[in-house]
From Swiss-Prot:
Gene that encodes it: scpA
Residues given in the record as Ca(2+) binding sites: 505-506, 523, 525, 527
PANTHER family xref list: PROTEASE S8 TRIPEPTIDYL PEPTIDASE I CLN2, TRIPEPTIDYL-PEPTIDASE 1
Keyword vocabulary terms for this entry: Calcium, Hydrolase, Metal-binding, Protease, Secreted, Serine protease, Zymogen
Single GO cellular component term: extracellular region
Effect of residue 267 to H: Can be very slowly converted during the acid treatment into a mature form. Almost loss of activity with IQF as substrate. Exists as an equilibrated mixture of nicked and intact forms of the precursor and retains very low activity
Propiece residue ranges: 1-189
Enzyme Commission (EC) number: 3.4.21.-
GO molecular-function term, one example from the UniProt record: metal ion binding
Active-site residues, record numbering mapped to chain: 267, 271, 467
Cofactor: Ca(2+)
InterPro entries in the cross-refs: Peptidase_S8/S53_dom, Peptidase_S8/S53_dom_sf, S53_propep, Sedolisin_dom, Tripeptidyl-peptidase_I
Activity sensitivity to pH: Optimum pH is 3.9 (for degradation of azocoll). Stable at pH 3.5 to 5.0.
Protein name: Kumamolisin-As
Amino acid sequence: MSDMEKPWKEGEEARAVLQGHARAQAPQAVDKGPVAGDERMAVTVVLRRQRAGELAAHVERQAAIAPHAREHLKREAFAASHGASLDDFAELRRFADAHGLALDRANVAAGTAVLSGPVDAINRAFGVELRHFDHPDGSYRSYLGEVTVPASIAPMIEAVLGLDTRPVARPHFRMQRRAEGGFEARSQAAAPTAYTPLDVAQAYQFPEGLDGQGQCIAIIELGGGYDEASLAQYFASLGVPAPQVVSVSVDGASNQPTGDPSGPDGEVELDIEVAGALAPGAKFAVYFAPNTDAGFLDAITTAIHDPTLKPSVVSISWGGPEDSWTSAAIAAMNRAFLDAAALGVTVLAAAGDSGSTDGEQDGLYHVDFPAASPYVLACGGTRLVASGGRIAQETVWNDGPDGGATGGGVSRIFPLPAWQEHANVPPSANPGASSGRGVPDLAGNADPATGYEVVIDGEATVIGGTSAVAPLFAALVARINQKLGKAVGYLNPTLYQLPADVFHDITEGNNDIANRAQIYQAGPGWDPCTGLGSPIGVRLLQALLPSASQPQP
């Protein structure tokens, strides 16, 4: 039996530390002792992919071509050409067997595998000590020690996720202050006001006569659920046909409405109702996963590589400050978004609702992830005043210290992409003034005071937040895909090459809500509050049509 075929035994060979997995325990967390050794759990292992450099180069080449002429990779062939190798999966299975773990499932295209077993086996396999922690925000499981594996297999493992169960993301929606009498009372008040998604789409001049037919929009959810009766009630009230909605269970999570409109149900039904109202001809696949680093990644990879539903658009309204993620988790997620770009899947994510700090209290400026990924279309927030079906006024959404504000700023993790080099992205406001990926790319109505009329758990309410902007523009992309007859895919590089009149430039406001210096201001052209501005839908479609004269990056 060769060394490669021989099962590993504890102490048989040196172990190597997997870099990028360190995560400090939360302030105020209290160590409550070890997790019971016979408790069962699962982790997601991310394996290296084949020809990783070739995939990135392919995406870069295709990004320089007009969207209608791009050659996206096919899901059917992706696993063989760019997934993890079958040899690596075989090595992982031997490692699992040797440590008393089961390889429950493998996603060859995504290069991920789920290993499960008792805590004692996980501790031995990865060289950690799993422990329980109590915190004012909730209890969680984490670990002491560095994540290690046998040195011979360390080069093939890029991440081990799921050891820590702390939530990695929060939903980016905010309820409008309630008014008595439902929608009618709100509409009669001077302020605040509310719009239906149809109103907002009209103001942004979404192309008419299109409904997303032939497209599948994936929606990522990390909690809550939707009530079919609520959805039916809502779409009937708008006079639009109810779209087909299916739920997909990931890592044991499922469609589980809580009955609390202000909880995660608010996010789930907001996403479906906004996008569904504007693309009722599309199929909607809602991927439910646990709110952990493993769950979030598995939801993304399941959607992107879904061989049956084949989403062409992915909408994400959950996220967290990029600095709160481990570097291994961010790299794994970003790799999945690269897969999406190669496959022609447009991924959109909310930029956050807590202004230029993204809710952190460390005195620094932060952007939200996954919106910060260069392969994700980051969606910021505005305050929209519409009149006669057109924009009367649009400014940066900022409700001040007692409210919310659009996320935005400069990434401390992702470098400035080539396609933003001429966008005048400022240096980071943090010490060192480093350059980085500018967030957001586009913006749309997000202020709860000018929010969206929706029905959550059977209750009529008004919701804002950048959570609404991701599904709003996901529906726009679905309409454009329908018209083009193919998916536009990775849009970011193209958007920055389009004429300025494709967007409504937003030049008033800032996203500081911490009573500090107003570092990030709106202004002409791209800015770290609203990106390029709000898209003018018909002009964006026209610019992407084959007949358009498109500048090449």
